[in-house]
Each structure stands twice: as C-alpha cells, then as structure tokens.
Design a protein with these regions (language model features):
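Eukaryotic adaptor/scaffold assembly regions
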Residues: 1-153, 500-503, 508-509
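WD40/WD-repeat beta-propeller blade-loop signature
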Residues: 150, 160, 170, 212-215, ...
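WD40/WD-repeat beta-propeller blade N-cap
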Residues: 154-161, 203-216, 251-257, 293-299, ...
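Loop/turn segments within WD40 beta-propeller blades
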Residues: 165-171, 220-225, 261-266, 302-308, ...
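Blade-level signature of beta-propeller repeat domains, shared across WD40, Kelch, NHL, RCC1
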Residues: 485-513
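A structural motif specific to WD40 beta-propellers
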Residues: 149-152, 194-200, 247-248, 289-290, ...
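Conserved strand-to-loop turn within each blade of WD40 beta-propeller repeats
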Residues: 177-180, 231-234, 271-275, 313-316, ...
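WD40-repeat beta-propellers
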Residues: 183-188, 237-241, 260, 278-282, ...
Length: 513
C-alpha cells in the first residue's frame, strides 16, 4: 500500500472546495503545486476525505475493542478523531471494570500499525457508521417551498459551479463559471422554468475540460451587456463577447485571479490576484493601464467607485483605496484602512460611493468613510458591526438610497456569515435592523432583488431562501443538491439563479404573489 503527498493534498483540496473555502482551496492547490499533479484528474466522490477518516476511526474502534478471544467488547463512549477515548464498558471473563484510556498519541501509533498491517487482514467486523453529532434540527419549509415545475436545472458543467451572473441588458442570458475550466453562456427560452433553455455556449479556458489549473474563479458582465470578463486560476483574465467569442486575453498576473469588476462606464476592467497586486485594464484595446502593489498578501476582492477610484482588500487584513493615474507604489494610495484583525474577504461601495463596507474572518463588518468630518482621523470606521459570531464571508449594499435606482428607500447593508445568519444593518443608525435566521449551515452568498424588496441567501446545505426585506420574513424556499456558492437575481426580479457544488445551476421562478 502506498500513499503519496499529492493524493493527500488532493483529498484536502477537495474537502476545502466542498466545504465552501474557495479562496483557501485555490491557495492550497497553488502552494502545493497540485495543479501539476496527474492525480487532479482522478474521479473522486464527494466527501472522500471524511469517508476515509470515518473508516480509519471504525478500524481503530474495532482494534481497540477486540478481546483476546476475538470477540468485540461493547462500548458506548464516543471514539473521536482527536479526543482521548475512555472505554467505559466492562470486559468479560474476569477482566475487571477498569476503564481503558487510549490517548491521542496511542491512537496515532495504532493508526500507523494498522496501515502497515492492512494487507494482512482477511476479515473486518462490520461496524455501524458513527452517529452524526452537533447536527442542527431539521427545518420544515414545506409551506414556502418552491413547487415542482417552477425551477429549471442546468447541468452541462462537469465540476463545481462557483459563480453566476445575469446579463444586465440581454436579460435572457446567464453566465456561469466552473471548476471544469469553462464558463458557459446560457440562453433562456422564455420567462419561466417551463420554457427551458434554448442553447448553451462553452467558453473554454484550457485545452481540455477539467484542467484544474484553469478553474474559472470569477466573472462579470460589462455594464452594457456586450462583454463578459472571466478570471481563471492560471492568472489570466479573458474578455468574451455575449456570443462567446474571445475578444481579449489579458496576461500579467502571476497567480490566480480572485475578483474582476468593470468600471461604471465600462472603460476599465479591474482584477485582483493571489500575486498581491491589482491591475486596471484599458478595454479600448485590451491593454494594461496600471498595476498596483499596495498589498503584502493575496488580494481577495475589488470594487469600483465611479470610473477612476477603486477599493481592494486582502488576506493582509487591510483595505486600500486607489485612483487610476496616481503612482501605484509607495505613498500613492488615497487611503489605507487597517482596522480588521483577520483576512478581509469582501469590499463594496454604497450606491452613491460615499461609504465603503468591508467584512472579515474576524467576524466583523465595518463601514468606512473618506469624509474625515465624519470619522475624525479618517482611519477609524464609521460603524463597526460585531454581532456575528463567526467569519463574515460576503456583504452587499441594497440598491437603495442616494445614487441608486430606488432613492426613496433607505439604504441597508446585508452581511452573511458562517454563523448561519444574514443580518441587515442601517448605516445611518449603525444598528441591526433584522436578523434573518433560518439557515442551518454557513451562508455563502446573498443578493438583493433589483427593487430591494427581497433578498436571496444561499447556504452550504443547498438551501436557497428568499426574504421580505421590510419585514425580515422568509417567504420562499428551495432545496438543491450540494452546496450553494452564489445566488443572483435577473433584472426583471422574476428569477433567482443558484450555483451548486453538484455541478448544476438551479434557475428558480419567483412570483411575488
């Protein structure tokens, strides 16, 4: 029996992906050189690492509880992966009632011996799988579940689907990006799921499907709907027309691209990469306009404020605001915010560009202002939201308030956390308006509807919820297979798309009444 480091790394990589740690999985694969290994093309069932660990524990449990005469001693105590095992059962045949203590070091030694002797085994006693612990109680969504016939499943990808985006102008088009080294542009046949889809165009990022060095990591339509930008694990940004023809191939980054954003007018494309830099590309000719080197670790997210100012965030715990044309090294940044104590996962400008929100693995979301009259020294956040109990992976501003399509409605900030909750905050009062608490697993994606009347949330348990923003009440539910990586509304507010780890996209019809 042989176990290679590449095989172990591949199991860990798949576990990270299946658990929703997309950035971590990309970083791990990049640093372990996993993309250069042939094992990445090996078919692997979901949950493989957990399955192997469970089987190893079962084997250790059998070995620990076998008596000298080959019988199994009954034991009700848990046999954990890391915690010491205390055997509370009495052994038969006058062995007495002394508990058998097996510590972590002893378990590790036994595991090594077991792996060496596994080929000599001729029979393994059947053992029931260990009970699942700390599982939340099931949630009954039958009253609000989306009925059969009101959703469409798109299933031509061959690996996890990480992101989706509806075209802002040609609203029957939706783009999806996957770990199979492709993006796809799907054309919906009609206004409802019953009409299905008419075609799907494949945008290949590698020589063959499934090339893990070409995973599509991010995508976004241009404001005019004519172009689609995609970022890949190979560090290349690509621009396609809406029919799927390649327009530009942008080569400059030295690591995976984590985020792409078009400027408001569509003149520039902004990219943030694992190589610690952000790049502004001129879309008039597909050329590099300016590269910025302010971060000391991978840049995870970027967002424009107008056509020449942007923000970026990084695993270096900082948020940096830059301006096109200002020197890209030294003291050239407009502002640098360093209030977070862990990796900063996302940054978003409010519709009018007056406020910048950031969220972090430190469990906080912060609202910043460049107006030093509001914040004093300008380096302190205007608001510091600390009510979440675990990492905050993403946040979104509502399309309301000044500078938005719905200026009469109050501005809100939504945050989604690994504590399973979505929270809505007021940037005016700094208070939490609603806690949207129904998910039983970490919430990985949220999206306001165009009117901001509703918000959709998707979790790693495959659950999609639609909530009434004003009342903070869940009104629709849909359960798909696998974990949800992203949710997105169409422009008409009649459909919500959710992309899954099961290689599929669900397009759900939404009827307000």
């Amino acid at each position: 029996m042989s176990i290679t480091s590449d095989e172990v790394n591949f199991l860990v990589y798949r576990y990270l992906q299946e658990s929703g740690f997309v950035h971590s999985s990309f970083t791990f694969a990049y640093e372990s050189l996993l993309t250069k290994s042939s094992c990445v093309n090996t078919p692997l069932p979901p949950g493989a690492l957990i399955t192997f660990l469970q089987k190893g524990l079962q084997y250790l449990a059998i070995e620990e509880h076998l008596t000298a005469d080959g019988k199994e001693r009954l034991c009700d105590s848990d046999f954990g992966l890391l915690s010491p095992h205390t055997c509370e059962a009495l052994m038969g045949g006058g062995q007495g009632g002394l508990p058998n203590m097996v510590g972590v070091d002893q378990q590790s030694s036994m595991m090594q011996d077991s792996m060496m002797d596994v080929e000599a085994e001729t029979e393994v006693l059947p053992v029931a799988p260990p009970p699942m612990v700390n599982q939340p109680p099931p949630v009954d969504d039958s009253a609000t579940e989306i009925p059969v016939g009101s959703f469409l499943t798109l299933s031509r990808h061959t690996s996890e689907v990480f992101m989706c985006s509806w075209n802002p102008v040609l609203t029957n088009l939706i783009a999806t990006g996957s770990g199979d080294a492709t993006a796809r542009i799907w054309t919906m046949s009609g206004d409802t799921a019953a009409h299905g889809f008419s075609s799907s165009v494949t945008l290949k990022h590698g020589e063959y499907l499934g090339d893990k060095n070409k995973d599509v990591t991010t995508l976004e339509w241009s404001p005019n709907g004519k172009f689609l930008a995609t970022g890949s694990y190979d560090g290349v940004a690509r621009v396609w027309d809406h029919e799927g023809n390649i327009v530009y191939t942008l080569n400059q980054h030295k690591g995976p691209i984590f985020s792409l954003k078009w400027s408001k007018g569509g003149a520039y494309l902004l990219s943030g990469s694992y190589d610690k830099t952000t790049i502004v590309w001129d879309m008039a000719g597909g050329t590099l306009k300016q590269q910025f080197n302010y971060h000391t670790a991978p840049a995870l997210d970027v967002d424009w404020n107008g056509d020449d100012v942007f923000a970026s965030c990084s695993t270096d715990k900082s948020v940096v605001i830059c301006k096109v044309g200002v020197p890209s090294e030294g003291e050239g940044s407009i502002e640098r915010f360093e209030g977070h104590t862990d990796e900063v996962n996302a940054v978003k400008w409010s519709p009018d560009g007056a406020l910048l929100a950031s969220c972090s693995d430190d469990g906080t979301a912060k609202v910043w202002s460049l107006d030093k009259k509001k914040t004093g020294d300008g380096a302190s956040p205007l608001h510091d939201f600390t009510d979440h109990t675990k990492e905050i992976y993403t946040l979104k501003w509502s399309p309301t308030g000044p500078g938005s399509p719905n200026p009469q409605k109050p501005l809100l900030l939504a945050t989604a956390s690994f504590d399973n909750d979505v929270r809505l905050w007021s940037p005016v009062t700094g208070s939490c308006v609603h806690v949207l608490s129904r998910h039983t697993q970490p919430v990985y994606s949220i999206a306001f509807s165009p009117s901001a009347t509703y918000i959709a949330s998707g979790s790693l348990a495959g659950k999609l919820y639609i909530w009434d923003v004003k009342e903070g009440k869940q009104i629709k539910a849909y359960t798909g297979k696998g974990d949800i990586f992203e949710v997105a509304w169409n422009k008409e507010e009649s459909r919500v798309a959710a992309c899954y780890s099961s290689n599929t996209i669900s397009v759900v019809d939404f009827r307000k009444k």
